[in-house]
Each structure stands twice: as structure tokens, then as C-alpha cells.
Amino acid sequence: SYAFIRQNISADLLFNGNNKSNTQDFDHYLRRLGYKFKNESKDCGGYIVLKNKKICLAMDTGSSPNPKYTQDYQSGALSFEIISNGKKLITNCGYYKKNNQNLNEISKSSAAHSTLIIDDNSSCKFIKSKDKLILKTGLKITQKNSVFEKNYWKINAAHDGYLKKFKSIHERNIEFFPEQM
């Protein structure tokens, strides 16, 4: 996954517990020892990443993990980021990891990400457990696919995070025409 995200993009995607990181020493270490990773996949670990030399389009397309692994999980399913020439155009807030319960809770909410909220509700629910917020009710990705052609990119995905309360499936479809940039 390091080759898929960090080495392919060379930027920090602020999905699910990630924040700005400095991997320069680690990258130098890998180069010094001759490690080279190549990842041609567009879909890995619950993320779809489409990119060319100028633009990167990434979307969180993963279902919620098991609750015991969710202390840093954010309810940002189907959120996306766009990077152009190394600069973020659309980004998520990242995750606030320090000891401020209010900021932890806000950064876990769907509202803190480039995704849908309905009637001030996040797609997932969290509960407090041993001074940490963990997942109470998660979501499942019900469909996902992508198209990556020279002149046309598309990511389509849907989840059931609003099904029980609002009887609604959230589907997001992003189309991009790289040659029009």
C-alpha cells in the first residue's frame, strides 16, 4: 500500500486517520538499499486512485473496518481528493489525534470530509470507549467501479450508511476529462 499511495502520488491523502507526514528519510532509505516498488493497480485497500503526470483523483471506496480497528477511522466514505500539479484542489480535513475530544469527534464526522451528510447525520455512528471514539454503526460499500482511459476517467461507488435511518443509498459518480485541463 505504500507504493500504491505514497510513491505513486507523492502527497498525503487525508483519509481515515492519515495526516501530513514526512517520509523523506524512509524514501531515501528505500532508494539507498535499491528497493523499487511498482504498482499499476488503480484500486487497493479501499481506495481508487486515478492519475496522470498533472492530475490525481482519489476516492475512499472502502467499507467500514471492524470496530476494534476504528479509533482513527473517519466516516468519510466516498469522499475524494483532487491534486493538480502537486497542489491540493479538494481535500479532507485529516484526523486530529491529540487529546481534544471535541476536535477528535469533529474530524471523524462526515461533515469534515468531501462527502454527503443528511440532516446533520454522518454515515457512521461512534461511541466513546475508554476515552476513545470507536465505531458503533458502520457502512458497507454496495458497488464500485472505475474507468481510466487517456481522455476519460470515472469513479462510481455507493454505500449503505444512510439506508437504515433515511432509506437511502448514497451513490457518487465523478467523471473527469483530462485533456480539457
Question: What function would you assign to each model-found segment?
Answer:
Residues N39, Y69-Q71, S75, E105, ...:
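Residues embedded in well-ordered secondary-structure elements
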Residues S1-T91, Y95:
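Carbohydrate-active enzyme catalytic cores, enriched for enzymes
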Residues N22, G94, N121, F177-P178:
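Alpha-helix initiation/capping motif
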Residues I55-K144:
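Catalytic core of carbohydrate-active enzymes
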Residues D43-C56, S122, F126-E179:
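Extended, loop-rich substrate-binding clefts of extracytoplasmic carbohydrate-active enzymes
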